[in-house]
Amino acid sequence: MPGPHSPNPGVGTNGPAPYPEPSSHEPQALDYPHDLGAAEPAFAPGPADDAALPPAAYPGVPPQVSYPKRRHKRLLIGIVVALALVSAMTAAIIYGVRTNGANTAGTFSEGPAKTAIQGYLNALENRDVDTIVRNALCGIHDGVRDKRSDQALAKLSSDAFRKQFSQVEVTSIDKIVYWSQYQAQVLFTMQVTPAAGGPPRGQVQGIAQLLFQRGQVLVCSYVLRTAGSY
C-alpha cells in the first residue's frame, strides 16, 4: 500500500530529482556589453535643433523659448513719428512767415498806417485827451474803469508835443515791420513846423507801434526818431 504523498514532489525516497534542463524553445538570456567604446555611444544624439536650445535653469524644467524682439521695430516707429512732427512744425512756421505779410498787407498798408499816425499826431497837437488815451491804452480802453492817471499822462504828452511843434504832417511811410496779423512797427517821415518859429522841416522821422482791433488802427506808442531842438 503506498504511503502518503510527499509535500515536495521533487524530493523522493531516492533523493532530490534534478531540475529539467532548459529546452531549445525557451528564450536565451541577453548579454549586455560590459564595455562601450567611444566610437559607439550608448545613446544616439538628438536632432540638431535640440542642441541650439539653451540649457534648462533647473533639472526637469523645459528650456526657455526665445521670442522675437520688437524693440527695434518700436524704436523705428518712434523715429518716423518724431521726424513727421518736426517736418509739420517746420512747414507751419515757413507758411506763417511767408503769409504774414500777405495777410496783414491790407490792414497795415501805407494808407491806413499814415491815416492812423496823422490822427494821433493831430490829437497831440490839439490836446484831444480822449483820442490820446484810447490810442495809448492799446486795445484795453473799454476794460479800464479808472482812466484818470491815463488822462493826466495824455495831457503831459500833449503839452510836451506842443512845445516842440506847432504843426505836423506825415509825408511818407518808410518801412513797415509786421509782428503779427494785428501788430506792426512803422517808420515814417513827417514835415514839422517848430513851435519856436522858423521854416518847416521835412526830414523828421518817427516810429509808431500800431495795433489793429475791431476795424480800427490804434497808435500804441510814438517816438521821435530825429534828435534836435525845436
Swiss-Prot record:
Region entry Disordered, spans: 1-57
One GO CC term on file: membrane
Span-the-membrane segments of this chain are 75-95
Entry keyword set: Membrane, Transmembrane, Transmembrane helix
Where found, per UniProt? Membrane
Q: Which domain of life is it from?
A: Bacteria
Q: How does it sit in the membrane?
A: Single-pass membrane protein
Biased composition regions of type Low complexity, renumbered to the chain: 38-55
Whether Ubl conjugation counts among this entry's keywords is no
UniProt protein name: Uncharacterized protein Rv2203
